[in-house]
Amino acid sequence: MNSLSTSTFSPVAFSLGLLLVMATAFPTPVPLGEDFKDGTTSKRPFTSPDKTEELIKYILGRISAMRKEMCEKYDKCENSKEALSENNLNLPKMTEKDGCFQSGFNQETCLMRITIGLLEFQIYLDYLQNYYEGDKGNTEAVQISTKALIQLLRQKVKQPEEVSTPNPITGSSLLNKLQTENQWMKNTKMILILRSLEDFLQFSLRAVRIM
């Protein structure tokens, strides 16, 4: 299998190409049971763990680049713990009940949690897209690639129709609230979002490896 590489393409061009490939490779899921009508076997494609794993690692690489850039530009490194501990963000987290840890692992429950969690992160990625002052190519790459990852994971969930989409009104309200903060707090929130997404994806990566 060819590995995901950005040696030739910019992060945005790579991610746009990746999203196009995912969109054309995976059709809209059919209702449960229709795959086997008329005695035919399912032609619905299945995502290999390797492809999902490589995509997660690609996103983690872009996040790492953004965190490094913010650290160098704004001195927003690990010394912001006091401010971060006082944040009022409700960022997605992975817990034992999500079935993604080795102890109590449940593949279906875990896939649902990862997919829904990434959907919940979308509003925060919109925030990064609006206010991140570094390399915009990285923010766009993270957002586009995360959407591609959601598509991949939906194909692995047995009942994708049960994957709930976050309330857009709630998301819009949160985004408006975040926009009213001063620049220092915006930068602090952005590094927190990046750290939280990185943690979530690290847990997801370990789970994908044992699926």
From Swiss-Prot:
GO cellular component, one term: extracellular space
Keywords on record: Acute phase, Cytokine, Disulfide bond, Growth factor, Phosphoprotein, Secreted, Signal
Listed GO MF terms: cytokine activity; growth factor activity; interleukin-6 receptor binding
Pfam families: IL6
InterPro entries: 4_helix_cytokine-like_core, IL-6-like, IL-6/GCSF/MGF, IL6/GCSF/MGF_CS
Signal peptide as annotated in the record: 1-25
Single Gene Ontology BP annotation: liver regeneration
Keyword Signal: yes
Residues bearing the modification Phosphoserine: 80
Location in or out of the cell: Secreted
Major localisation: secreted
Disulfide bonds: 71-77, 100-110
Summary of subunit composition and partner proteins: Component of a hexamer of two molecules each of IL6, IL6R and IL6ST; first binds to IL6R to associate with the signaling subunit IL6ST. Interacts with IL6R (via the N-terminal ectodomain); this interaction may be affected by IL6R-binding with SORL1, hence decreasing IL6 cis signaling. Interacts with SORL1 (via the N-terminal ectodomain); this interaction leads to IL6 internalization and lysosomal degradation. May form a trimeric complex with the soluble SORL1 ectodomain and soluble IL6R receptor; this interaction might stabilize circulating IL6, hence promoting IL6 trans signaling.
Function: Cytokine with a wide variety of biological functions in immunity, tissue regeneration, and metabolism. Binds to IL6R, then the complex associates to the signaling subunit IL6ST/gp130 to trigger the intracellular IL6-signaling pathway. The interaction with the membrane-bound IL6R and IL6ST stimulates 'classic signaling', whereas the binding of IL6 and soluble IL6R to IL6ST stimulates 'trans-signaling'. Alternatively, 'cluster signaling' occurs when membrane-bound IL6:IL6R complexes on transmitter cells activate IL6ST receptors on neighboring receiver cells. IL6 is a potent inducer of the acute phase response. Rapid production of IL6 contributes to host defense during infection and tissue injury, but excessive IL6 synthesis is involved in disease pathology. In the innate immune response, is synthesized by myeloid cells, such as macrophages and dendritic cells, upon recognition of pathogens through toll-like receptors (TLRs) at the site of infection or tissue injury. In the adaptive immune response, is required for the differentiation of B cells into immunoglobulin-secreting cells.
Protein family membership: Belongs to the IL-6 superfamily.
Protein name: Interleukin-6
Organism annotation: Lama glama
Lineage, broadest ranks: Eukaryota, Metazoa, Chordata, Craniata, Vertebrata
Gene that encodes the chain: IL6
